[in-house]
Amino acid sequence: MIEIPTGLPAELVPLSWLLGVWEGSGVVEYAVGDETVRREFGQRISFSHDGLPHLNYSSYAWIEGDDGPVPFVTETGYWRLRRRVTDGDPGPAMLPPTDERPFTTAEEVETLCNADGGFDVEVALVHPGGVSELYVGQVKSARIDLATDAVLRTEGAKSYTGATRLYGFVERDLLWAWDIAALGQPLRTHASGRVSHVD
């Protein structure tokens, strides 16, 4: 059963099952040429909100070493329902809204439902290695399907051109899979994990 926290902005209800801190493990397996990289890792994922109509997201992964955990990778970003920004939303930058905040009731949020019975979502992620991703997709019940709409790379970043991600709430755990197109390779399986709610 998924509990909806008191004070959660109505726009976040379709994503509310993600809220909290999750911890578990996963595996990365990716072939480049004749070499295949395979690593198991531990992972901690956090989804939170600060009263605004988006989720704050962070993921930190580590590899178990002989002397304890060794930092591996991290990413951070924001998840929200995909809709046109209105005068009731802040921005750009630090500009305040000039109208009432939109989509504050369940009835108003239901108008954002798509033809498939889900809600369109967008996810903006930043990686410290010089890659930023914008994903678009859909949340339907306790499943999220995402595909990159845009990838930005700094001059020094490794080659990375696109990705898809899948998230699902299964047996009270968060399962995910991440396919990537990188290092001159087409889109293919890259990593997956299973994390449990710890907070």
UniProtKB/Swiss-Prot annotation:
This protein's pathway: Nitrogen metabolism
The short motif GXWXGXG is annotated over: 20-26
The UniProt catalytic activity note for this protein reads: peroxynitrite = nitrate
Q: How is the cofactor bound?
A: Binds 1 heme b group per subunit, that coordinates a highly solvent-exposed Fe(III) atom.
What is the required cofactor set for this protein? Answer: heme b
Q: Which Pfam families does the record associate with it?
A: THAP4_heme-bd (PF08768)
Record keywords: Heme, Iron, Isomerase, Metal-binding
- Protein transport among the record's keywords? no
Family statement drawn from the similarity comment of this UniProt entry: Belongs to the nitrobindin family.
Query: What's written under domain?
Result: Forms a 10-stranded antiparallel beta-barrel structure able to accommodate a hydrophobic ligand in its interior. In fact, this fold hosts the heme group, which is located in a wide surface cleft.
Quaternary state and interactors: Homodimer.
What's the protein here called? Peroxynitrite isomerase
